[in-house]
């Protein structure tokens, strides 16, 4: 499994941009770029925070939240979970940092982006707010989502939002070496689905082959 990820990483070209690339030379959005919408039909705004909520209710529902990973020696909470029901607390707010967000534009489907928990935290825990995919967990047979990623870097922190085949949206993990090589692409050949596995009685976000998590986005008031 790990070898597959390394192979995927090697298949993406590394593009080196000129140092003259600045805000005066912004990314040109494709003409067919489709903005991601929240539950009210408004376009996602990279300046705002959102709850990632399930498109289902009751026991099938539950918001995404930041929590302590079992058996983790990290100094801060670094696990990404989903509540076991939509009855209870709201999830941890997130913000989306897309390839175009630095230029005041929105968040779009199939756009490579970073996800960051939008919470106040200590200086020690600042780096434990950015989503990434962790190492392979042999006991669960997959790779778990956690925090500790980096924004805008060629590592394990790149995701996409795509239309679900059922309701709402799906999250994809895309192991890309450079976001600038292809910031917008509908070719998800090398992306993997984000779903849920059960870990110590909790629903943990992880990479899955089937049954991806269907989500919607609700603006934090």
Swiss-Prot record:
Gene3D superfamilies: 2.80.10.50. SUPFAM superfamilies: STI-like. Disulfide bonds join 76-125, 174-191. Coiled coil: none annotated. Keywords: Disulfide bond, Protease inhibitor, Serine protease inhibitor, Signal, Vacuole. Residues 23-28 form a propeptide. It is found in: Vacuole. GO terms for molecular function: serine-type endopeptidase inhibitor activity. The keyword Disulfide bond applies. Pfam families: Kunitz_legume. The record marks 143-144 as: Reactive bond for chymotrypsin. A motif (Vacuolar targeting signal) lies at residues 25-30. Residues 1-22 form the signal peptide. GO terms for cellular component: vacuole. Induction: By sucrose. The record marks 95-96 as: Reactive bond for trypsin. Belongs to the protease inhibitor I3 (leguminous Kunitz-type inhibitor) family. Inhibitor of trypsin (serine protease). May protect the plant by inhibiting proteases of invading organisms. This is Probable serine protease inhibitor 6.
């Amino acid at each position: 499994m790990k070898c597959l990820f390394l192979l995927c990483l090697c298949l993406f070209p590394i593009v080196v941009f000129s140092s003259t690339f600045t805000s005066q030379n912004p990314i040109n959005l494709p003409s067919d770029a489709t903005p991601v919408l929240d539950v009210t039909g408004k376009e996602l705004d990279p300046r705002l925070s959102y709850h990632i909520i399930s498109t289902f209710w009751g026991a099938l529902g539950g918001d995404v939240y930041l929590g302590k990973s079992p058996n983790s020696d990290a100094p801060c909470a670094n696990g990404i979970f989903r509540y076991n029901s939509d009855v209870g607390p709201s999830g941890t707010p997130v913000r989306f940092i897309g390839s175009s967000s630095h230029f005041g534009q929105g968040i779009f489907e199939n756009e490579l982006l970073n996800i960051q928990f939008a919470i106040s935290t200590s200086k020690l825990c600042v780096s434990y707010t950015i989503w990434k995919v962790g190492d392979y967990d042999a006991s669960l047979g997959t790779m778990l989502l956690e925090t500790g990623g980096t924004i805008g870097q060629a590592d394990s922190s790149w995701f996409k939002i795509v239309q679900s085949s059922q309701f709402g949206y799906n999250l994809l993990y895309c192991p890309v070496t450079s976001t600038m090589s292809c910031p917008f692409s509908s070719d998800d050949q090398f992306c993997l689905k984000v779903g849920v596995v059960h870990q110590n009685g909790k629903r943990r976000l992880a990479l899955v082959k089937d049954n991806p998590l269907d989500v919607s986005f609700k603006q934090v008031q």
